[in-house]
Amino acid sequence: MNRIAQTFQRLKERGEKALVAYVTAGDPDLDKTREILVGLKEGGVDILEIGVPFSDPTADGPVIQAAAQRALKTGTTLSRILDMIQDLRKIIDLPVVLFGYYNPIYAYGTERFAERAKAAGVDGLLVVDLPLEEAEELRGKTDSKGLDFITLIAPTTSEERMCRIARRAQGFIYYISITGVTGTATPSRDNVEREIRRIRTHSDLPLVVGFGISTPEQARELASLADGIVIGSAFVRLIAENADSPELAARVSSFAREIKKAMQE
């Protein structure tokens, strides 16, 4: 059982839900990203989702797009991110999921990437612009290294396609709670509840809800429907607002603690 499965099992036994936190690697720089990730762990985050910056992040809203541009300007690369994760593994045992686009992985080399990601301590991969039908080559490489290939299901996903995605899912299923890009709308509880029931008929894997969750109240409400939630834009916005502050990691940690507390109420 890998770190992702162990985490969901442990949380289930405790009657808790997973807080998955997304940050863009290299924003404001990789040294501070490392400090932020440590702060997230101290704040009670259960799974770290580390974004690989890309120049054309079509699934991301303006907050994360801006973070990607800042990270690229500081020279952040996939190779340097993997180095950071490997260094982070000396002090953090939380599951790490890489979130990004296919282009940087393709440019790096899929086999080389899978080997390096495994060696660095990555547990899962979510490639937002790689549909199921086009993922087999990369997935073959990641499967051979024991990395979970995490898949997305959206409100617009048909029943037939949902069934196919669910059958091939690993680690957990990521349900996109809104149509559009990250951080730009608020999910409807009724819609999310209905879609989660639909997904659960096709898979027993843990299910997390992401996109549009930014407050403790939203976290509490949506966590009650799923096995966990993902918060991204709210963390990235907080990082941007405090990038030059010596209290950056502490403020991110405090916000994580506030979210996690709300999820337990």
Curated annotation (Swiss-Prot):
The keyword Repressor does not apply. Pathway: Amino-acid biosynthesis; L-tryptophan biosynthesis; L-tryptophan from chorismate: step 5/5. It is an enzyme of class 4 (lyase). Belongs to the TrpA family. This is Tryptophan synthase alpha chain. The alpha subunit is responsible for the aldol cleavage of indoleglycerol phosphate to indole and glyceraldehyde 3-phosphate. The keyword Ion transport does not apply. The gene is trpA.
